[in-house]
């Protein structure tokens, strides 16, 4: 009887502790999302229900180009970031060289540099009158590199470079943690029975780390599909990233269209999260059956 009473008090305390953050979530996250979805289906003049905002986004040239350009950049960033990060993580995990230790101590450094500072620093280096161009002027005029201009501003190349700068350390951190959890005895046992490096990787390392790779993919995609600072400063005027296009709509007080763009960004992010959650749920179901 006394134990039941204590359990009731404990459960009541837990519920009471959860109510404040739940109310904050409802007020600052759930409610704005619902309001945004409702507003995206409203006519700007009459406030009547309509699909015109979404029809405009997926049929007109400017918003359609923004959606495709953003998605293309996000997918390319995910592929390059995760691929490079996985190779870096493998090198740091399975190499005892001084270089791997140096990389292990330094690879998180870009995470401590504010994004705005990093983007402007990059501009001063690669712009047409930047550091690289000025250094190239020191070369003989007969050199092919004399007066070299990287041409990395206001196009996809510059955005991709900065995306890799921001995302490789983050993805590497996640994957390194996953690889560190793989027991050395598993690798040694596989090698003892004659398994080569490729077989060890595909049959042991990759299956034991792919869940964390999916986590990296999910977060890198979500952060880039809604990015604003980098494309706003060094991106082209057309096509624009969805974040930059969203800011333009707000400035023009086209709030219903802006709400529709916000919903599209949210759906892109939700899709990547769903893939990760579905994979984990499927694996959990498989393990429970086993």
What are these regions (language model features)?
Residues 5-10, 54-57, 61-62, 225, ...:
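Interhelical loop and adjacent transmembrane-helix boundary motif
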